[in-house]
Amino acid sequence: MPPGELIYGFGLQLLSFSQRGKKKTIRVNADPKVDTGDSHAPVPFYVTTRGYGLLVDSARQVDFYCGDARLKPTHSAKAASGAVNTPDMTRKLALQDPGEITIEVPRAKGVDVYLFAGPSMREAVQRYNLFSGGGLVPPEWGLGFWYRAEQHGDTEAITKLATEFRERKIPCDVIGLEPGWQTHAYSCSFAWDSNRFPNPKGFVSNMGKQGFQVNLWEHAFTHPSSPLFDSLLPYSGNYGVWGGLVPDFAGEKARNVFGDYHGRTLVDIGISGFKLDECDSSDFTGGWSFPDFSRYPSGVDGEQLHAVFGLRYQEAVWQEYKKRSRATYSLVRSSGALATPYPFVLYSDLYGHRDFVRALVNSGFAGLLWCPEVRDAKNSEDLVRRLETVVFSPLAMVNAWYIKNPPWKQIDRVKNNAGELENDWQTLEARCREIIGWRMQLVPYLLSAFESYAANGMPPFRALILDHPEDSALAEVDDQYMIGDRMLVAPLFAGESERKITFPEGKWCDFWTGKVVRDKTISAPATTERIPVFVRSGSIVPLAQIGPHAGSSESTTLTVRVYGDGSLSWQGGGVAGIGLTLTWDEKNQKGSVRQNSQRARYTVAGWEQLGAEA
C-alpha cells in the first residue's frame, strides 16, 4: 500500500469509516461496543482509493490488518524529535508510510479470494454487486412509510391505529406486528395468538383493503409448542437458544422445512414480509446465542453458522415469495457477503444517531441496505432530526414496539404508555406528517435509484468518497451520503449548534429552494427547518403527489422539479412501473415526457424550475 491509499468497507460498520491503520475482525455480533470489526453484518470485502476491491470468501472469522502490521525494526536509531507521541499520532503516520494489508483466517485450511478491478473504487463496488447477483428493486409499498405497533397490540388496537393514520392523513404503507402476535416468543411458535388475533386471515385482508401491508416479527429459534418443531428437529443443532431449536440454515432441508411452513401459513394469507430478529451473535449482549462449538447436520459448526445464519434465514423466507412470484421487502438483523440481491434491510438495537448515519454511509461499500429506524427520542428536536434521516434512507420506519401511542403524541415512554399525551401534540404531529410526506414524494426517485442498483450495481445509498476518491476533503466524511446519481443528504443531529457540509466537485443546488451553492464547504445552523439536501445543478427530479400510501392513485401523479438548466435528464424504467423519461428544453422553458414502457403508471401534472441563473 503506497502512502495515502485509503481503505473502506467491511460491511455494516457503525463505529468507524476510513479503515487504514486498523485491525478488523469479521465476526457476527449484535450491538458492537468497540471498533473491532464485529457487526450485525460484517463482510470480508474492502475497497481502496486505488480502485480495486477484495473479497475473502470464508465463513470463518477473518482478521484484516489494514496497514498496521509491521515488521520489526532491524537497526538502532536516534529519536526523531522530543515530541511525546500518542496512539492517534501513530495512526496518522501509518497513513503517510508505505504499508501492506495482511489477512489471517486462523481456522481455515484455505480460502477463495476474489479481486474486483475498477478502474475506479465505485466501479469495483459495482462489479462486486453484480457478481453477487445485482441489486434489488423493492415494491413501491416497501419504499413508503412503515410503522411498527406496540408489541401487545391485538386486532382491535392495530385496526384502530391504522384507521387513525388514514383519518389524520399520515401516510403509511406497512404496519409491523411485534412478538405479541404469536402464542410464544423467545423462543418462537410462529403460531397466531387466537386471543389477540382470532381471525388472522380476515385481519390481514381488512388491512389490505385500507392499503396496509402487514409485516411480522420473529426469530428463528423454534419453541417446542410450534407446529414446526417436530419436522425441524432432525435439521437442527445440538444446542438450543431460549429453549428452542436452532435451525441448520446452512443445509437446504432445514431451509425448506422452515420456509414451507411460513409459505403455507403466513405468506398465503397475505403477509408481505418479515422482521427476522436475533439472527446475529451475542458476545456483547448477554451471550444468549448458540456457541461456536455447536454442531449441525450439514457439517458446519457454530462459528461457521453464525457467519451465514442471517443470510440463509433470509433465503429460507425469500424463497417462499419467489415461488409465488410475489415481491417482498423485509427486515433482518444480520447479513453478510454477497447479499446484494436480497430484499432485506438491516437494523440494530443500538441507537446512536451518528452511528446510524455512519452505518448507512458504510453499507454502500458492501451491497447492504440499512434502516436508521426511529424508536424514541430525547425531545421533539431529536425526534424530528431522526425522522428526517430515516425518510432519506432505504426503509423509512418508526419502530414503536414499546409505546402504545405514536411518539409525536408523547415522547416520554412512561407517560406515553399511561395515555398521558402532550397538550399540544398536534403541532409535533403536523411536523412529522410533513416529513413523512417528503418520503412519499421521493418514491419514484428512489425506485429509479434501485433500478440502477439492479442494472449496473450502483449502490442507491453511498459515501461521497466512493464517487470522488481523488477528493481528499471527502476522505473522512461519514455523515453525508448520496442517494441515486444526483442527490446529497447531510443529516442534522439534535443538540448541535451547526454542522459542516462538504461538497464534491461540480455545482450544487439546495433541494428545497434551488439556491446555488458556490462554496466547497458551508455551515448549516441548528435552526435549519429542514434536513439539508442538495442536488446537482441541472438535475431533473420527479416528486409524487402525497397519498395515503405509495400504491394510491394520488401517488402516481408527478410534479417535476428542474434545477438550473435541466441538462441532466431523468429516467424511470419499466421494472418499477415508472416507464418515463423526463427532459427539459431550457431555451423554450418547456419539459417533455416520453413513455418508454407499457407498464408506465405515472403521469406528469406540472413542472417547476428552481435555481435558474440569468
Regions found by a protein language model. Give the residues of each.
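Accessory, solvent-exposed terminal regions and/or long lumenal/extracellular loops of proteins
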Residues: V535-A614
